[in-house]
Curated annotation (Swiss-Prot):
Catalyzes the methylthiolation of N6-(dimethylallyl)adenosine (i(6)A), leading to the formation of 2-methylthio-N6-(dimethylallyl)adenosine (ms(2)i(6)A) at position 37 in tRNAs that read codons beginning with uridine. It is an enzyme of class 2 (transferase). Keywords: 4Fe-4S, Cytoplasm, Iron, Iron-sulfur, Metal-binding, S-adenosyl-L-methionine, Transferase, tRNA processing. One of its GO terms (cellular component) is cytoplasm. Its cofactor is [4Fe-4S] cluster. Belongs to the methylthiotransferase family. MiaB subfamily. GO terms for biological process: tRNA methylthiolation. [4Fe-4S] cluster 1 binds at C31, C67, C101. Binds 2 [4Fe-4S] clusters. One cluster is coordinated with 3 cysteines and an exchangeable S-adenosyl-L-methionine. One of its GO terms (molecular function) is metal ion binding. It comes from Prochlorococcus marinus (strain MIT 9211). Its EC number is 2.8.4.3. This is tRNA-2-methylthio-N(6)-dimethylallyladenosine synthase.
Amino acid sequence: MLSTKTLPSSKAQESLQSPTKGSYWITTFGCQMNKADSERMAGILERMGYKQAEEELQADLVLYNTCTIRDNAEQKVYSYLGRQALRKKLFPQLKLIVAGCVAQQEGESLLRRVPELDLVMGPQHANRLETLLNKVETGQQVLATEELYIIEDLTTARRDSSICAWVNVIYGCNERCTYCVVPSVRGKEQSRTPPAIKREIENLANTGFKEVTLLGQNIDAYGRDLPGTTPQGRKKNTLTDLLYYIHDIEGIERIRFATSHPRYFTSRLIEACAELPKVCEHFHIPFQSGDDEILNQMRRGYKIKTYKKIIGRIRELMPNASITADVIVAFPGETNEQFQRSLSLVEEIGFDQLNTAAYSPRPNTPAALWPNQIPEEIKIERLRKLNSLVEIKAKERNVRYKDRVEEVLAENTNPKDKQQLMGRTRTNRLTFFPKVDNQGNSYKPGDLVKVRVKDIRAFSLSGVIEN
């Protein structure tokens, strides 16, 4: 149990603010799917009349949308909950909610551990937030973790950006990777229909959005659960078909998608990305390990030669494409030779960026029970070596941008320099540039700007506007 039996000291009480009635605060942990879910839940709260608080300790409804991919993310949630449990002792009107994957995984045990919680809700219940809150208002402590079919959400999301939007197209995951909890907490794959997706993107375009990122745990598995096949025997509604279907929506300048699984990244999809002008040349395709035996133990369903073939075809058709990925080091039983194969793959492919992690045992996954766990000190050392190589290769990849003119979609003012805008290239490189060009023309978020790159860093660029 996180809460204490006694109230905080008078001095501590003075440091805690009384909640502002009708205000909310959402803290999001983890992946882009969680960010999209949080935007939808914020939209529901604002439809109900809530206003976003200026800071977390002012809110009288606090929601943590949680991630359980790694243990450190989960533990961070509990530290946040301890602070809010303290507030709830002083301000009983505070509503305290845990949503997302920790909620789904822990369920009733989370309510026992943190009895101050009003609502524990899994990710499949994000669209039901209003219904669940109405139950909370009657004095109930609510648990919502049962599996259900995700109905189309008619709520307007409260977007964190007015330029770029996340659009969920497939929920859940049918894979059974031995290290991953996602299938157990997000349920089986459920694809939205193409017309529903198109309507959402059209609405975004009508309100000024310029870029959409299609989201899915395995985005390229989209449509496997939808009916219909072509005369050639393939599924009728694939991600490739969806890209063609939404491509010509007026007002949308750019289309991205994430995250891809190598098993479903077809040649037809690569060719469509090369053909369709709005689809950006950035592909996030996790490889997880550079060793075939480890991939087999992970139950990933492909070999490294398949992965290399995918990257080769992308670079053949789109030479300037950026490739990013996820990789795990120190998976149970990983030898030094197997780890070296991951380093060799990073060296060979030259990723633009990698999300790196040391293996973290997760509850209810096969790999967590295996006896050959890697000692912590070896995990740390392997991760250090990998991160060092990643930074070197990222800098090498960025050299190609030097003095090149790139199309950048301006997204925001640079918070560290109000005279600069920041945005991303088509290849997803964060880029900083002046708001005003050398002829006195001003630019704003939402503008597509030609920027000549002058300075390069490992993970960002800066330059001047090209007239």
